[in-house]
Amino acid sequence: MPYTTDIMGRSNSLRQSMTLKNLFDITCSQGERPASHWLEGEQDRLYTYGDLRQKSLDYAAYLAQQLGESNKGRFVAIQQETCKEWFPLFWGLIMAGYNALLLDANLSDEMTGHMLKEAGAVGVITHRKHLIDKGYVQVLSEDLFKAPAAPAGFEPTFADSVALCTSGTTATSRIFVYHEKAVCEQVLNSELLHKLNTRIVDN
């Protein structure tokens, strides 16, 4: 089944409400559309955008429970290699009400602790347990990926910021925080690229 993407329509919709919630809703608006493919043995598997929306919601409910109501609005680091669950991991954190700090998945325990302290973060979603201050909440990604379905009536509360850091190899690394409006502005910049080369997206 052929799918088309209305770049102009989506861009205009995003301009109407430049929030992470609206960006997520627009991204997942064609729920039946394939979003990602991977191989399990010889079998081709896929997630649709509807699948990713639901997984994001499931992860959000799990993270809200693990990280706590009182920590909503604060930063939580994501320290995870690229994988098929990365999309719902990121959006699940945002939908749970926590701002996302993106960290290099290969940082040492010492540098991970340093970056968490610099960002005022309350925890980290990680592929391995770190030897860091016990005051930080550590959520293992393998546990998150097994999260049960979100309970009926669970309502996401979207956060509004994403933080990136320069190479975390020295103690002088810097953290840059992007409010949701700035994130949406960056997304809208892709419209200019599409105008220059329409083959980027099948329109």
Segment roles from a protein language model:
Residues 33, 71-73, 121, 157-161, ...:
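A general structural motif
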Residues 45, 62-106, 203:
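Conserved AMP-binding/adenylate-forming
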Residues 46-49, 161-188:
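Conserved AMP-binding A3 loop
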Residues 55-59, 176-199:
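Conserved structural elements of the adenylate-forming
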Residues 26-27, 52, 56, 76, ...:
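Adenylate-forming
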Residues 12, 35-68, 77, 81-83, ...:
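Conserved AMP-binding/adenylate-forming core of the ANL superfamily
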Residues 91, 95-156:
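Structural core segment of the AMP-binding/adenylate-forming
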